[in-house]
Amino acid sequence: MQLLPGDRVLIAEGGGLIQIHDTASIGTTTSIPPVDFPPWFEYSSPTWELQMECLYGERLSQPYLCRKTNTLRFVLNTLDTVYGLVIPIDDHLGPGPELVMLMDFHKPEGAEVFLFGYNSAFMHGDGTSDLHILNYSWPEPDGTLKPSDSLVATLDGDRWRYLPSDFDEGSGRVVMCSYNEVVVFDFATL
């Protein structure tokens, strides 16, 4: 779930349902927890909805602001595709939300943790030494898509845990935890 500008909320469910709701129509209460307050979805119908194949991983990346197009962008994935979700900042101007394919790929065996950046992603699994690195681009204004690629880095050790892991796309550094240490890998030169 992600709050959006303009009194909107974005909801992405693991089953592949993605919705945007207008929260301005939802009543407010001063009771915490609300007393006899029906669930919010009884007051709100989605203003935009897309049903796609099952989402995989954490469902949505953090939002990325694209000033050139005045949109928010999110990265999400299924078992075989990385997608970008483009949402206009002002829902009254321009086209509505759009789902674009960023990269075709097949989830490697054992890859469970997905760390998404704007143009790259990392995947790894529990107890494996393989770190899968994906590089993709967003479509140009004319719709063309630059080539994407991936590589596998084999890390020392074989006891990497699911969480916590994180990466900084700008510096090219990935932080991973084994069962007894925290390690920072630098992929800036790749």
Predicted segments, located by residue:
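Extended alpha-helical scaffolding segments
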Residues: M1-R8, A12-L190
